[in-house]
């Protein structure tokens, strides 16, 4: 049974979050949680939270055994960017893009 968890509008760029997502794709959830715990990236904490939510969803909604679960799919899509302005010299301004992303984790017991 496939179970999904999402974190939409996560305040990290999709490019940075994909580096972390690639580490755990296809792994058993216990190994994936271990990897994320010791990965020194901001995105690792965000992905770990989504993975824990997917595990809880599988256990509560589908009655799945945690020991059999694997991360079958994990993908990170770009969310909307917040546009901000940074003042510069001589009355100019630069535009800053505060990027967001949508993190999706799918766990399955098959």
From Swiss-Prot:
Organism annotation: Mannheimia succiniciproducens (strain KCTC 0769BP / MBEL55E)
A biological process from GO: translation
Subunit description: Part of the 50S ribosomal subunit.
GO cellular component, one term: cytosolic large ribosomal subunit
Cited PANTHER family: CHLOROPLAST 50S RIBOSOMAL PROTEIN L22-RELATED, LARGE RIBOSOMAL SUBUNIT PROTEIN UL22M
GO molecular function: rRNA binding; structural constituent of ribosome
Family: Belongs to the universal ribosomal protein uL22 family.
Protein name: Large ribosomal subunit protein uL22
């Amino acid at each position: 049974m496939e179970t999904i968890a999402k974190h939409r509008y996560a305040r990290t760029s999709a490019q940075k979050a994909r580096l972390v997502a690639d580490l755990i794709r296809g792994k058993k959830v216990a190994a994936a949680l271990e990897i994320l715990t010791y990965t020194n990236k901001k995105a690792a904490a965000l992905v770990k939270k989504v993975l824990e939510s997917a595990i809880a969803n599988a256990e509560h909604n589908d009655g799945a055994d945690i020991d059999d679960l694997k991360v079958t799919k994990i993908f990170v899509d770009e969310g909307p960017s917040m546009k901000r302005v940074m003042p510069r010299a001589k009355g100019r301004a630069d535009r800053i893009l505060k990027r967001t992303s949508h993190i999706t984790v799918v766990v399955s017991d098959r």
